[in-house]
Amino acid sequence: MSHPAYELPIDVNQIQALIPHRYPFLLIDRVIELDLEAKRIVGQKNVSINEPFFQGHFPTRPVMPGVLIIEALAQAGGVMTQLGLGRDALSKLFYMVKVDNARFNKQVVPGDVLILEVQMKRLIRNMGCYYGEAKVNGEIVASAEIMCAAARE
């Protein structure tokens, strides 16, 4: 399937046409930069006090779970991969299979705008490898190397 040339920003409705994630697990609100030739994407997640995970993490001092920041990076990588391959949300699913060198440098709290910068390192057959950095106000709050693999049918 070929995609129309997306104009930036790519909004949440267009994102949902590309990846299968939905509320409450859709963790990217928009794409603000995309360079398929350079295999680079920049997404945005507006972190709201209304996020379901804040009910228990932690009620008196809400902090976005680090694993969800990594998931948000993976979803940004997924959007880029789907666009690069000309696929949509109904295509074969990719699953996160490995995370290396995850670092969490600062807490992400309600009101933060999480910027998701992802670079694809390689795509070989059914596996994609990415490096991602999540930033708030230009400061790296988390980073990781992520590997995803297409589901077997």
From Swiss-Prot:
Main location, first listed in the record: cytoplasm
Protein name, entry field: 3-hydroxyacyl-[acyl-carrier-protein] dehydratase FabZ
Compartments it resides in: Cytoplasm
Pfam families listed in its UniProt record: FabA (PF07977)
Source organism (scientific name): Xanthomonas oryzae pv. oryzae (strain KACC10331 / KXO85)
Top-tier EC class: lyase
EC number(s) recorded for this UniProt protein: 4.2.1.59
GO molecular function: (3R)-hydroxyacyl-[acyl-carrier-protein] dehydratase activity
InterPro entries linked to this entry: FabA_FabZ, FabZ, HotDog_dom_sf
UniProt record similarity statement: Belongs to the thioester dehydratase family. FabZ subfamily.
HAMAP family: FabZ (MF_00406)
Sorted UniProt keywords: Cytoplasm, Lipid A biosynthesis, Lipid biosynthesis, Lipid metabolism, Lyase
Biological processes per GO annotation: fatty acid biosynthetic process; lipid A biosynthetic process
Domain of life: Bacteria
Active site (UniProt): 57
Record's catalysed reaction(s): a (3R)-hydroxyacyl-[ACP] = a (2E)-enoyl-[ACP] + H2O
Function per UniProt: Involved in unsaturated fatty acids biosynthesis. Catalyzes the dehydration of short chain beta-hydroxyacyl-ACPs and long chain saturated and unsaturated beta-hydroxyacyl-ACPs.
GO cellular component terms listed in the entry, alphabetical order: cytoplasm; membrane
SUPFAM superfamilies membership: Thioesterase/thiol ester dehydrase-isomerase
